[in-house]
Amino acid sequence: MAVFNGLAHTRACLESLRATTEPFHLVVTDNGSRDGTRELLERFPYPYPLTATRGSNDNVIASLNRAWRLTDTEFVCLLHNDTEMVEPAWLSRLLAALAAPDAGLAGLYGAKRLRANGRLVGRTVVHSLLPKPTVKAPWEEVAFVDAVCLCIPRKLLDSIGGLDEGYGFYHGIDRDLSLAVIDHGRRCLVVHAPFWHHGGRTRTRGFDVDPGLERTDRGRRDAALARFSGKFRHRLPCDVRGPRERVADWLRARLP
């Protein structure tokens, strides 16, 4: 987990992890928070083990790479700090999915189809977001897993070379990792484990004060998408739906 301010969200996230049934070791990189986050991590009133490091806020993906490389676990789970886990078995369910044949990446939000330009097709999204999860239990195969929460075998992440730091602030990194997993002959899965996501507040902080920040962010997203679609032109478009599901989606899209 990488954090920069957002103390209230981080505290709520860490509190929600108390009930997790699967043992885990949390690694948090604090990228220069000035709102009490550092102090929270220093006193850390939670029962699970923590490794806390400090970094800069120039490249969050680089921070995540440094964080997961500090671990010695068989699996690595990347989690946004603005999430709250409701299902105590959320991690167990991710690990169970990764035990399925050819599984390589598991998460809680994703889409079954990516266009040639790298954009997802909205009607193929499946997720565990509350209040209305849409993914069928126990899991469904997808073309990509969103970075809000994803779990991957450490050896696979290492063989891929880690997260591609060229994307900067999250944009495109989840699509990139997902197709890299598929390139390695593995499948991506979205698991049924309900959770709350409080929605990109780190990235959008300050948009209401300075509209220029939003324009800059939009430009970064467009650049990241172009980078991704160029890098994986051999894999795009990507559609993991079966024939029956494609026909059903086609009919739904055309019915009034």
Regions found by a protein language model. Give the residues of each.
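A conserved acidic beta->alpha catalytic loop
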Residues: 30-39
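A recurrent flexible, glycine/aromatic-enriched loop bordering the glycosyltransferase active site
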Residues: 132-152, 170
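Short aromatic/hydrophobic "clamp" motif used to bind/position activated sugar donors
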Residues: 76
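Conserved donor NDP-sugar-binding/catalytic core segment of glycosyltransferases
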Residues: 84, 88-121
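Short, acidic, metal-binding catalytic loop of nucleotide-sugar glycosyltransferases
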Residues: 15-24
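Glycine-rich, basic loop-to-helix element that forms the pyrophosphate-binding segment
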Residues: 54-71
